[in-house]
Amino acid sequence: MRVLEGLQPAAALGFFETLCAIPHGSRDTKAISDYCVRFAQERGLSWQQDASNNVIIRKPASPGYEDHPTVILQGHLDMVCEKNADCDIDFSKDGLRLRHDDTYIFADGTTLGGDDGIAVAYALAVLDSSELKHPPLEAVFTVDEEIGMLGAAALDMSGLQGRVLLNIDSEDEGILTVSCAGGATSCLTVPVKRVPVQGKAWRVGVRGLTGGHSGVEINKGRANANKVLAAALQGLPVTLCSIAGGSKDNAIPRASEAVVVSEADDLAALFAANAAKAALPETEQHAEFYCEPAGAGEMLAGSEAVLGLLNAVPNGVQAMSGDIPGLVQTSLNLGILTTDADAVRLTFSVRSSVNREKFGLIDQLKALAARFGGSYSESGEYPAWEYQKDSRLREVMVEVFEAQYGRKPVVEAIHAGLECGIFSDRLPGLDAVSFGPQMHDIHTSRERLDIASTARTWEYLVAVLERL
């Protein structure tokens, strides 16, 4: 007997259990991709599979819907593989050990992969049904979303007919996501030369800041340790030996430290006075500045340019949305500051839900790098999914939601990247919405999928397709 037998929606959860038996971590998607191809072959549906393991399956419209616009059902095949220390599952060859109680489906000791296996399961159930009413369908299953949306980036979309996209990769029932940020990782490099130390060496820094995620928490008034330290050093008679802070471009750094050389006898007092002027937000009650003697053999010629650049670069929220209240529209975060043998590097996470603002901010960083004798490089650029003031899909999904739930859904945008951004960039005129059933603690071994929510969301999907 199958573990999920008897639960509703039966068809979708049956496919979900089958998918969970197939290893499908990021970069290990060949088997699950091949399963989707076999599914299509067995039902006489047209299909495509590319070298990245992305799969497209097409199904004709149900009777009476032949002249309706094609709808894309989209989700990703890969999952995040995390497990408890005492769990002996080998994600490369073992399926998940599904369990459920009256409320949730979960896996024993591992992530569940509801993100985004339930999307694939919903789509397969729609493709398998001969009873549902729907327009022509293109089910698009991408790979390696969890490690940078690599599958969507590699997908040839030139053959896609659909310009209406249902992305089922959200984890909060009742929320319709209609826009996301685009972004890039920007690196500013300032060359330096090492010369013998002249003066006394000190270790100075700031620690104990709150930190946080630069997408979700950039608007919560949290100080960036790299910017705080640069401000505390501004105007002091110091030469850098090294400076470093943060380890991820998308995390607001909590601590930053420099080794400096100074001929001033009272540098500790001067640094303390500068630090006292730091306009730290009220959220930073545990910030601690320090200045203590250190050892150093070399200092950096050219450190004036480094400190000048650090104090000149923008950071944090740059613009708020005029369409969606409370949404950060454009921001950047100086997440990583490092000193190498011949250069100091500033690494930023740049985000904006308006593509022209993202590129404008990048141009500003390029100009500042050049002004201070540095260079600019970039990686991981991805497009924004811009908010559409007029969206028939959004209107239909709001109406169907109100009819089913008796209340309005929350319509929101997020200050982070989604595959919808790549699809909207490649498919002109795309009308897209992201939604999904309720999940908790995704990407952890505590991940669980709400059974009742999964049933409601299935009913919602079916009703939306009938209206499109």
Language-model segments: which ranges?
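Zn-dependent metallopeptidase/amidohydrolase metal-coordination segment
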Residues: 12, 329-331, 335-342, 349, ...
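His/Asp/Glu-rich mid-to-C-terminal helical/loop segments that flank catalytic regions of hydrolases
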Residues: 158, 221-236, 264, 304-311, ...
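Active-site-adjacent substrate-binding region
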Residues: 222-244, 387-430
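Acidic/His- and Gly-rich active-site-bordering loop/insert found
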Residues: 2-103
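Substrate-recognition/cap regions that form aromatic- and gly/pro-loop-enriched pockets
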Residues: 327-416
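Acidic, glycine-rich active-site loops and adjacent beta-strand->loop/helix elements
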Residues: 77-79, 140-148, 169-173, 210, ...
